[in-house]
Amino acid sequence: MNEDDNDLDFQRKIQEAECDVVLSDTSKQQPTYNDGISGRTVAKKAYISKQSIRQAHYKCAFDETHETFLTNKGVPYMEGHHLIPCTSSNAELFWSKFKRNIDCVENIICLCPTCHRRIHFGSKEEKGTIIKSLYQKQILSLKTVGLDISIEELLSLYD
């Protein structure tokens, strides 16, 4: 399974996830990994992304006026995006450096499908514009849970 298929599968799991309790301290839970044919990946938890989307009231963090379609559950379809990309190398780095898990509520941004795809497949300039905006909105939450990263470091993770 390639990275794009893996992300689509994860977005599907987010839509199906149940999250009836408010999660806290998700950044303090040690990351877990899956070892597969395509290598080692972080075992991301869909219910954590679901909570981030709910907390954002199903609004795109880049532009709240962006509209999308309704899911079969009657809520706007939104996707969860890890601002600090949730790769195994990043997860290992942040755990070893800060003892923090990047698969946490504070690192997951609610995005409309168009903005989410733009971050992954857009031009470098478009990616930079969105990432800088999201960083400004999210940096205090990241620092609150011990995920300290500069905008330059963050942008380098998207190259």
Language model features by range: what are they?
Residues 3-4, 17, 22, 79, ...:
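Intrinsic disorder/low-complexity signature
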Residues 10-17, 138:
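Long, compositionally biased, charged low-complexity segments
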Residues 77-78, 84-159:
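A detector for short metal-coordination/catalytic motifs
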Residues 1-13:
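Mixed-charge, low-complexity interaction segments
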Residues 14-75, 87-104, 149, 155-156:
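Short, charged surface segments at domain edges that flank catalytic/cofactor-binding sites
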